[in-house]
Amino acid sequence: MEKIYIVVVHQVEDFAELALSAKPFSSIDKAKEYFNSIVEDERSNANKKDWEIETDTDVCFCAFEEGRYTENHSFVELREEEIN
């Protein structure tokens, strides 16, 4: 039987320092709560740094410094994963 887990993926690269995490949840409500708190922080940081916010939806947030995406960006995604 397949189980579906909700995963929040959070990646931040700031001047070539990479931080990546993937946190699983069995509850969509808890995953959304965690996702929203991370996005709130990342949105605030992006605005302070004058980064371009490319995507800001219920399941994805992406922001980056203009012209320096590979060095300075933030990405947060809420997604479902099937585990066999």
Where are these regions (language model features)?
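Short, mixed-charge low-complexity intrinsically disordered segments
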Residues: 37-84
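Residues marking helix boundaries in flexible regions
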Residues: 5-7, 29, 54, 84
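A short, exposed loop/beta-hairpin motif centered on an aromatic-Gly-Thr core
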Residues: 16-33
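Short aromatic-glycine-(Arg/Gly/Cys) micro-motifs in beta-strand/loop hairpins
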Residues: 1-20
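Short, flexible beta-strand-to-coil junctions
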Residues: 8-14, 27, 65-69
